[in-house]
Amino acid sequence: MGSSLSNLNDGTNGLAMGPGLGDIPESCVACVFMYLTPPEICNLAGLNRSFRGAASSDSVWEKKLPENYQDLLDLLPPERYHSLSKKDIFAVLSRPIPFDDDNKEVWIDRVTGRVCMAISARGMSITGIEDRRYWNWIPTEESRFHVVAYLQQIWWFEVDGTVRFHLPPGVYSLSFRIHLGRFTKRLGRRVCHFELTHGWDLKPVRFSLSTSDGQEASCEYYLDDVERNEALGKHKRGYWIEYRVGEFIVNGSEPSTEIQWSMKQIDCTHSKGGLCVDSVFINPIGDVKEHKRKAVLKEA
């Protein structure tokens, strides 16, 4: 059994077993790797010399990088990526790259190679953020940006943001990351406080997004309804929740796409408070052709 596995991997136990994986030309292995994900390629790299060589090939990793990868590299100092192989460039870009005064981050997904983005609460416009009677900035390790905006109490609740970026063609979703209640650490344990959490069960919060080419999406959510949530087994208080606003399509005809978003509850008949705003995420969810195909099938 051990002899057979050795021959399968190396093709060097040459008495009678015939060709093995080690006899496959590196160029052929590279062609197969074009259809595999980066984690799959890395897992197979240890099989033998041909697989290891193909797993480091620039031609393989060039296909895994997004078409705008040079735009991402331009956000870094040249010495970070100068003379790197395409595989190493992929590794660099799969880690978050901060920009816009470190209030935004962009990176590529390690499996799909598609571009993802996050925007901190500090990178958005928040009504009343300068007044500590309404808002406070709370440092925390629970945010990728290490700080969240905490609302104590306000009547006019509005959070807006915008970003312009060269996104590769594809279908993207936008979502807000929100937390009901204030959280702290006590004796190493996470403790949540809800004394100021109120007003989110009276009227829904309206979420919206729009793009520079005219796409729009909107939705409404009640952020807090303790009795209903408990009945359904959905516990929102004390947890980070991602509220999906909608989808938009980038066709690639424009050099860059501007995305605008907002989260509002501006009914001033009641106050609301006890809410943490962390960030907005823009994530790829598919390619344009597949999206159009599903739309056609749905209409049929």
Swiss-Prot record:
Pfam families: F-box-like, PP2. Residues 17-63 form the F-box domain. CDD domains: F-box_AtSKIP3-like. InterPro entries: F-box-like_dom_sf, F-box_dom, PP2-like. GO terms for molecular function: carbohydrate binding. SUPFAM superfamilies: F-box domain (SSF81383). It comes from the Eukaryota. PROSITE patterns: FBOX. PANTHER family: F-BOX PROTEIN PP2-A15. This is F-box protein PP2-A15. It comes from Arabidopsis thaliana (Mouse-ear cress).
